[in-house]
């Protein structure tokens, strides 16, 4: 009984009872035209309308005067909401608010700016003389009160519920009394209250399920970018930005997607409201029960989770309530504007790379107010931009008003380019009319040409992939023409990062039609049979077994004691290791020192520390001892003899993945299951790597290549080994998961690891860039990430970026990784030389050009990838891009000049000698010498220069045996010089 009375008393204290205030204040009320009759209709219907209506309170003449205060706070808060108003259902219920800048008084600079798809001006009139009693409040101020048309009030359950619904980010009026009060009455009471009380009632309404018809169509989205908290509606793209971060319950209760927006999600007309709340020194604060607030907040969070769309299910269905299921609390990313910086080759003009005029991009910038300066390069986004331009041109040419049912805003970018002011009507005989009509036809023709090239079995992102490959091939062809080393680097990039899938012409495959070709192929096959037998790998284990899986060693892979190591490994240097592991959230950690301090167990300690710090062992129900058993077994299956692809590389990729997952733009986007799956994929992505490339395994007809049909051979093998190790006793870290959760995680891990195949690089890049630019062109600027395909695409690119993150690390780390990778390449080249195979590009230790290869690697592979990732999470990756550019400049400065400095004095003589040994030039020189009467001197000079040529040739041939450093072109040129000298 006492507890019940206490709760009732607390609720009474929390209820915002109306209080009489002594000082009157001028009230300004914005009403639709219609006079007193219309206002009477509103008052008549007020009794049946229980929904509070939003109002905006403004200070006088820009002064800091607030009608309401925020409890326990003396700071200034500014809240801006960009939502969507207008549209409505097909029945046209409710009118959209419309208007421009409304100036109430010359001395009062308050304005309410709205935009809508309706072309008529908003009929508001100014009502003055209305005063309200303010009680003990010591200041006078004015306020605006938005009142919607009676038709929208009578259609409250329809789609256009715009301003008749509750606004959690504004002050609201009382529900029952508002319509009964005459705005001219001085005894009217103020129904405003502080922000926390407003949020408290918002929580009560959410917990009670009010307005569920509209809230069921939204998914809450919280994405923090830069220094401010940003809440983004996944259904309409509105953003709520506060001066400081609020509590989770407060943010959830102010998910404004359905509060100021139509529920059918067809309106994208933006309306901006700005609310300022400033505390005053002598205001009486309204107190409420914190216990009730916390209870209702918990109910609100639980309700929001139940309403979240399941976004990471295998079947793209609705997720369950468990945190392990696909329903993520926030399912989207806010795309920001990008700064001006050095751009990759993807942003160069299409006309320089594509011969067909049908493939040239017509739009180089986005027709969007929020992303007006961002360039678009993907064909599908360019098609959308062109079609949007065609639509806007059609509206200008036909003078047809835009329909309220359209969810696309009116944009007159094309009209502006044609020299005509936006929104101005055009006459048929004007020059601007003819020019705009011609541009429209050209835009439409270009779109049709592009759409005709789309094949039915390919996605729209393949258009970007094919375009990027053509541009890269053109770039590499120019790069290879520069020098012999450039040709080698181009071959390496093409063979490694471009998929070998090609379109085959079926009739051309019929070789039996040409008997001569058949005979030639048979002879060539007999000649190469012996060489093929020598280059073929020895027979391995039966294909029914997974090669590389060792028998588990219980004495080294299991922990029998009660105490587990603090960082997962037993090491005498635990303090030093703990200091380094404390910086796991830092980009460019000293990973080599971690490998040293962890007794060559970097992967185990890094993975264990990350899973512990993220509380994934608890959320995913992983026993710590089982996790350590699996990680130790996994690390044992990494080949320690590999210079690069060993457990240290896996630890580096896992740590980089952890840092990228901590990106502020991705905060709260992914569930624990998704985060754990991405980290698990990073741990296993190179297990049992033989230190050889996929192309080598295919060329040598290895057992792995035969087993996986030459398709992502190593990546499939890594997955098979890792999931096989989970079947070892005491190693199944996912044993406590439900069957559906385990299937989801397995599919996710498979997709992520397969995406680490470097031949899929261009497809991954094209998919991500198409998705980002399409959302920008659409005008929303928000990636909803509300289905499995979009979410796994982001995670695939995240791990792929981590796998290619060495050039973005500090220069000492980068140089060390480069040396290890090149040594592994050289070992493969040595094996190819011994087997009589063709040496792969960049694998010949005698002709490698390390510096130039790194510059080409950054320019054509790493920079475009990280540029796109930085576009996605801007501005969180700007420091990484800066480091990448610095490292690129360093290697560019280290490229030996051509010719090298050591041969500067010899090169002019060598070039002169090459022309002297030519017959015609020699005769001319001898003739000139005979005419001068100095024949003997000329002969001695010729003999001396010839000896110099031979000496330089010998010195050049002797210097060609060294390693890389850009010596290959000079060595090849010197080897031909003795032949000239002997002529």
UniProtKB/Swiss-Prot annotation:
EC number per UniProt: 3.1.4.53
Binding site for 3',5'-cyclic AMP: 645-649, 686, 803, 854
Biased composition (Low complexity): 112-121, 145-167, 219-234, 248-261, 938-955
Protein family membership: Belongs to the cyclic nucleotide phosphodiesterase family. PDE4 subfamily.
Organism per entry: Drosophila melanogaster
Skewed-composition ranges (Basic and acidic residues): 35-50
Domain PDEase: 569-898
Co-factor note (free text): Binds 2 divalent metal cations per subunit. Site 1 may preferentially bind zinc ions, while site 2 has a preference for magnesium and/or manganese ions.
Residue sites binding a divalent metal cation 1 per the record: 649, 685-686, 803
Coiled coil: none
Signal sequence, start to end: none
Protein residues bound to a divalent metal cation 2: 686
Protein name in the entry: 3',5'-cyclic-AMP phosphodiesterase, isoforms N/G
Compositionally biased tracts (Polar residues): 51-60, 268-287, 358-368, 401-419, 973-983
Keywords: cAMP, Hydrolase, Metal-binding
Compositional bias of kind Acidic residues: 174-199, 920-937
Co-factor(s): a divalent metal cation
GO cellular component terms attached to this protein's record: synapse
Role of this protein: Hydrolyzes the second messenger cAMP, which is a key regulator of many important physiological processes. Vital for female fertility. Required for learning/memory.
The keyword Metal-binding is assigned to this record: yes
